[in-house]
Amino acid sequence: MKNTKPKVRLWSVLTGLTAILTVAAIVGNIIANQYATTINVALNASTYKIIHGENTGDTEYFKKGFASDEEREAYEAELCATVEAEGAALLKNENNALPLASGAKVSLFGHGSVDLMYGGTGSGSVDTSKAPNLKQALEAQGITINQTLWDLYSSDSMMSKYSRMTPASISDTLEANTQYAVNEAPWSALSSAESSLAEYGDAAIVVLSRSGGEGADLPSGENGTSDNWISGQEGDGNYLALSAEEIELLQNLKALKDNGTFKNIIVLINSSNAIELDFLNPEICGEDYGIDAAMWIGDVGQTGINGVGQLLSGAVTPSGSLVDTYLYDNMANPAMYNFYTQAYPNAAEYNLLTEGADVQGMYSVYQEGIYLGYRYFETRYEDVVMGTAKAGDYNWATTVAYPFGYGDSYTTFAYSNFNVTESDDAFTVTLKVTNTGKTYSGKETVQVYFQSPYTDYDKANGIEKAAAELCGFAKTDVLAPGASEDVTITVKKSELRTYDANNAKTYILDAGDYYFTAATDSHNAVNNILAAKGYTLTGAKMKEIQAVNACRRDAVAKGMKLEEAMDKWQTMEQLPAEYRS
């Protein structure tokens, strides 16, 4: 009998090797397909072939607009600065703090002054290797900077000890994506530069910077904050509030302003995430930090800081508008309560909660529907003013610091000749804008809002509508003092539709009264619409409305039907005495 064991062993080895190679080929094929673009780039492999036919027409569909890369880069740099100069929003300007006088000598404070937020995270990041800084931008406009203070903030010792703590742009670890800290330098760390401040006392410019974006969400605890990561060395976990060190900085600058060292205090909001702005209103925060001017500059892009220099110097008059509603306390926004992460029920089963993979095992639930941002704050405001059922206790003035669309100017503008005409598929809004100031030329951003009818059908079918919605905007040319311009904004009727998810399963356009208004921001838009409905909103009237509504709610709580309470008390004079204080 022949010995067959060697053949059996050989076939076993070959079978095992074949199985391994098969698995490797399958896995390799999947990986290769998934990363085909990266592999082709690394190997310089071409994935296409150009075959020229008989027709040799021009196939260069996208023509070069520049003679050289240098020309293109110069254009892009100028464009970025222009976008910033046209988009930054002036929030506050008292005592003629802005623009800075020609030749002004100023001191720059805050770690953000030497380490600006140029862009966001992930795909929003910016190459800063060629980006100018705030000092260069101001010097280009003839402003002199306190070099001693600048050198101190820029020193290796300060940068290593008091730099922002931000997570990696993209990380697979949930913990790594929530490691945020402002880490501002304490006032004591600036003592070596204190003797230089008086010489550069035309203004103290404070830069408040915050990061956050794609792949690096802000801390999200039970209430939209993190207990594990701090806003400052001794913060409370609220990354979008001022840290203890930032408050200390403002307090000391106020003291220096009071003793005459500084003429003005100017704050730059260098963040695309909405920082709480209670510190700009002494009545809200309970302390006066002596801030004369504040400007939201967002993330400035590669060369946008040059636009900020133009704004601060008065070379350009601010004409930008806020794209968010800024609050005194972000926890007043109900959407904050949806800003948290929780694990999928089967996340542990698939090892999605282990270190290095835990961001894949989390999710957030959104419940706010259309009531996000100004659609919530302005709709609830109108409900309170009109005494709508279930409006609850709500005071817009102590909640909202600056509404959506807000943006001040160095000059003033007036609107006139407002008119709306209708065509088959659109409404055309026209008005006249006049620069009523006497000193500065500038542009004005005209915003058009609408309100659609809130019908019984809408209520029956769960269709929600906001008190006002932005439907168009336009910016004037630069208007000299006394000059005017006619502005035309076209609104397509299709943009007024609402989605009916429960019944029609499509977009609908309700019959009824539609209100259009041109306004400087979302809040003024709602007030214009309320005035058109017959509500005159003086301060006294607002107090009356709030008092009447409070009395109605109290009456309902004590057993009176809402309809009876509304019929019984319509004015302040009709209220019980305890509500008339």
Regions found by a protein language model. Give the residues of each.
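C-terminal non-catalytic regions of proteins with extracellular/luminal or membrane-system context
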Residues: 1-581
